Amino acid sequence: MALKSKVIRPRDFKYRGYTLEELQKMPLEELAKLLPARERRKIKRGFTEQEEKLLRKLRKKGTARTHCRDMVVLPEMVGKVVFVHNGKEFVRVEIKPEMIGHRLGEFALTRRFEKHSGPGVGATRSSKYVPLK
């Protein structure tokens, strides 16, 4: 008996039951009702000058550099490239539909993962006997 292989197709993106096209046509106030409380409050209070400037640049060019790590990812930003500052450099972030409702800073990590290796020469008395490479 031959086994049938399943074809796995990528599912269409939906955010709380709405497709990306529906979200892009939706007014900002209506979109805010779908977002979590913190992001909803941020949109309700309005955007800062830098955030407005970022949105204008994205509409015009499609890419922008920014320090606005608090900016909420909106449906109109999907497909654009944003360079977000992480404290040292600008990290390239390509906006995908799954990022809607999150903050830009979540995708530009400020701390680097540091993997410490074994003890070095002269670390402690007990590490003298650890064979060196």
UniProtKB/Swiss-Prot annotation:
GO terms for cellular component: cytosolic small ribosomal subunit. Gene3D superfamilies: 30s Ribosomal Protein S19, Chain A (3.30.860.10). GO terms for molecular function: rRNA binding; structural constituent of ribosome. It comes from the Archaea. It holds the Pfam family Ribosomal_S19. Keywords: Ribonucleoprotein, Ribosomal protein, RNA-binding, rRNA-binding. Protein S19 forms a complex with S13 that binds strongly to the 16S ribosomal RNA. This is Small ribosomal subunit protein uS19. It comes from Archaeoglobus fulgidus (strain ATCC 49558 / DSM 4304 / JCM 9628 / NBRC 100126 / VC-16). The gene is rps19.
